[in-house]
Amino acid sequence: MSVFLGTHQNRLDAKGRVSIPAGFRTALRAQAAAGEALVILRPSHQYPCIEAWPTAAFAALSQPLDRLDMFSDEHDDMAAALYADAYPVDADREGRIILPDTLKEHAALTDSVAFMGLGRTFQIWEPAAAERRRAEARTRSRQLALPAQGRRQGGADA
């Protein structure tokens, strides 16, 4: 499976277009099925950024909806949260996408954007906000207590 790695900065042109980094385009094309949009863009619920999902990953994200009663408030709320602000987007020949105005406003994008790889997905940020988020993530990740490979409880070697 192709993954999205690194942070890349590109200019947003006057028409609202931005070039997807080449490595990200390659990963998206490797995952896209014929006739599908290249990527699904949606506002993050947690951060002032745009989430970018390969179509198959977005479909997997929506699978929990299948477990809810289709006519319930919970289903309607989840469907609205997932789909109402989601935009399927294709790139032009130069690898550029057009960012919808509502998403640009959500992420406070003006003239430059930062593409931040997250493995299976990526995010699109205002560059200074992306740097702050990366610093915050590094700090918080140091506080996570992940079990070491090959170690027993108490820190003794296996």
Curated annotation (Swiss-Prot):
It comes from the Bacteria. Its main location: cytoplasm. The keyword Protease does not apply. InterPro entries: MraZ (IPR003444), MraZ_C (IPR035644), MraZ_dom (IPR020603), MraZ_N (IPR035642), MraZ_sf (IPR038619), SpoVT-AbrB_dom (IPR007159), SpoVT-AbrB_sf (IPR037914). Residues 7-57, 86-129 form the SpoVT-AbrB domain. It holds the Pfam family MraZ. The keyword Transcription applies. GO terms for molecular function: DNA-binding transcription factor activity; transcription cis-regulatory region binding. It is found in: Cytoplasm, Nucleoid. Forms oligomers. Keywords: Cytoplasm, DNA-binding, Repeat, Transcription, Transcription regulation. This is Transcriptional regulator MraZ. It comes from Gluconacetobacter diazotrophicus (strain ATCC 49037 / DSM 5601 / CCUG 37298 / CIP 103539 / LMG 7603 / PAl5). Belongs to the MraZ family. One of its GO terms (biological process) is negative regulation of DNA-templated transcription initiation.
